[in-house]
Regions:
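FIC/Doc superfamily catalytic core
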Residues: 1-115
């Protein structure tokens, strides 16, 4: 998003969230907000970290555990974000994040059982 449009784009994102936060399941809502924030890309640095914080904030706020994007999956994560920015393909993003969510939960529960 061009610099001159950043304020409007971010305000629109917040308004969209407020209007739709009860319409979607928390994971889907978190993915949409994350992807759109990444598409807006308001900062020179740190957009990914802030986007993942938004993703997990929405999940935790709705009493869902947070999701982790594993280092070995970062390349696919970046490809998904690029695809979303080009053609707003939400299905690929949902598929990716659902797999990551399952992976996160499996790793956490396995680690918990080991201890």
């Amino acid at each position: 998003v061009p610099v001159k449009d950043l304020d409007d784009a971010l305000n629109d994102l917040v308004l969209w969230y407020k209007k739709h936060k009860f319409r979607f399941k928390p994971l889907i809502l978190a993915i949409i907000i994350h992807n759109q924030f990444e598409h807006i890309h308001p900062y020179k640095d740190g957009n990914g970290r802030v986007g993942r914080l938004l993703l997990n904030f929405i999940l935790i706020k709705n009493k869902y555990p947070p999701i982790n994007i594993y280092l070995e999956d970062r390349f696919e994560y970046y490809k998904i974000l690029q695809k979303y920015s080009r053609i707003h393909d939400l299905k690929s993003s949902i598929d990716f994040f659902v797999r990551q969510y399952k992976k996160t939960l499996e790793k956490v529960t396995t680690k918990h059982k080991e201890n």
